[in-house]
Amino acid sequence: MEFTKMHGCGNDYIYFDCTRQPMDRDLASQLAVRLSDRHFGIGGDGIILIEKGQNADFEMVMYNADGSRGAMCGNGIRCVAKYVYDHKLTDKTTVTIASMGAVKAIDIQVQDGVAVGASVDMGAPILDPAAIPVVTDCKPPVDVPITVHDTVYKMTCVSMGNPHAVVFIDRSPREFPLEQVGPLFEHHPCFPDRTNTEFAFVQDRQNIEMRVWERGSGETLACGTGACATAVAAILGGYVDHQVTVHLLGGDLQISWSGKAEDSVRMTGPATTVFSGKIDL
């Protein structure tokens, strides 16, 4: 079966074009675990199936590296947009892509006939604790105290189609013990569906530095929905302006949001093809 390895700011997935070669979704979960292994597989943060859409131009079906189903991936959706354009599945530079029922509109950035990135309408942030979901009496869930391993943190919880807990720290997140603390947030009992966790340092009113621990995948070099959630949390806290650059380990994403709960968050960033190949399933 043919595959393409792609990444957005280092957040890499293995993509299967199921418009041309259908795949059983029961197989996909097992395949995600096998192929995501960076020593014995292709290596990636998971796999993404590209299918024809029913309520959108295309549908993306995402599986994390542990085989669990992912609801949305901001970096992945940009790569899907690049794939369908570069492989002539569409000639449109604005496409709609669905993931677990949520439809996003993507403006594809093209240079010399090749898609190099995309700007995505990520929809309005979800700040209702029950819908995120997170167990808290704080509405909206801003600066919520949480005790993790005898340390009290303050987090702001946001859903961008998947749950995020954003923690602002007073130093570069490169110095933060993410490998120890991230899993404790992911599996904390206040998150019924687990959570993605971002540890962020506000450099100035236009720049945020961030590391992320993704549920089901661990640390990744970038997380598009996490960058959106972090920008939303920072704007709610009054730390930054309405347009910011989020600096991740794998690259930069531009995020904008008006600060109004009903308005969409817009994410802009690159999409890159690494290589293509064939694998026996």
Range-by-range predicted roles:
Residues M1-P22, V120, T136-V158:
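N-terminal, positively charged, Ser/Thr/Ala/Gly-biased leader segments
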Residues M1-V114, A165-L281:
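A glycine-rich beta-to-alpha transition motif near the start of alpha/beta enzyme domains, typified by
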Residues G70, G117, A130-P133, V144:
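Flexible, glycine/proline-enriched loop segments at strand-loop-helix junctions
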Residues G117-S119, G123-P125:
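Membrane helix-loop-helix hairpins that form the core translocation module of multi-pass transporters
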Residues A124-I126, M160-H164, A271:
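Glycine-rich beta-alpha junction loops
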Residues L127-A130, L178:
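Short, basic/low-complexity N-terminal boundary segments at the transition from targeting/disordered tails
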Residues P129-C138, S276-L281:
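Extended Gly/Ser/Thr-rich low-complexity repeat segments
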Residues M155, P163-V166:
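Selected transmembrane alpha-helices and immediately adjacent juxtamembrane segments
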